[in-house]
């Protein structure tokens, strides 16, 4: 930790101890972490002298909307409780970048692709997409469960597609998913932008997904 007022986290203060996984209930990526720092000093608790105490640290990250939260569980012989740790902006950035790096190392895909692929493969309802404005952002939702699959600030390209017919498609055996505006024949997002572009879609017989 940095030697500042907040004891600010640094990347060396934690490790992803188990594999990250998609949380279908909360629509985020669940990341178990090891605490390599003084939890008493950082969280203002007092367990250093309790041999029965155990701290479980984890983060929940949604790369589509850019939301990340951190929680810790305290388990002792006499009590157990969970609390959220409210990160500073600097810590939020540090931990987000670390999660992105570890996702690439372990899954060989960006967090966004991991999130969307896992969501699609575990979704237990039909996927009917709608593009609409919410506050100062424009989002593509699954209307059946409220999951956000893509987002841009208002004024960007996505805002031009509000009210249009939006579909989810996949192409070939590459397990590449894309979000498309059928009215404009435009790809709004591809889960693997390096391997697929608009020309690839024109050359391949893409099939719409009805789930």
Task: Tell where the protein language model's regions lie, with residue ranges.
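Amphipathic alpha-helical segments
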Residues: 5-13
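Acidic, low-complexity, intrinsically disordered interaction modules
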Residues: 24-26, 30-115, 122-128, 135, ...
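Short aromatic-glycine motifs in intrinsically disordered, low-complexity regions
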Residues: 145-153
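Acidic, Ser/Thr-interspersed intrinsically disordered low-complexity regions
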Residues: 203-205
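Non-Sec secretion/translocation targeting segments of pathogen effectors
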Residues: 207-211
């Amino acid at each position: 930790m940095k030697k500042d007022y907040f004891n600010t986290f640094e990347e060396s203060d934690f490790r992803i101890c188990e594999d990250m996984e998609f949380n279908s209930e909360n629509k985020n990526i669940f990341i178990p972490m090891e605490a390599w720092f003084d939890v008493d000093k950082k969280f203002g608790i007092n367990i250093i002298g309790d041999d029965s105490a155990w701290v479980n640290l984890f983060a929940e990250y949604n790369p589509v909307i850019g939301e990340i939260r951190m929680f810790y569980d305290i388990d002792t012989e006499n009590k157990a409780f969970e609390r959220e740790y409210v990160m500073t902006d600097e810590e939020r950035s540090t931990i987000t970048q670390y999660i992105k790096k570890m996702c690439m190392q372990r899954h060989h895909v960006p967090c966004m692709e991991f999130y969307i692929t896992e969501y699609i493969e575990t979704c237990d309802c039909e996927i009917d997409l709608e593009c609409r404005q919410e506050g100062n952002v424009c989002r593509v939702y699954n209307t059946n469960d409220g999951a956000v699959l893509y987002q841009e600030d208002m004024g960007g390209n996505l805002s031009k597609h509000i009210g249009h017919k939006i579909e989810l498609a996949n192409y070939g055996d590459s397990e590449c998913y894309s979000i498309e505006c059928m009215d404009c024949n435009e790809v709004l997002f591809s889960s693997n932008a390096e391997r697929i572009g608009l020309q690839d879609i024109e050359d391949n017989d893409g099939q719409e997904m009805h789930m």
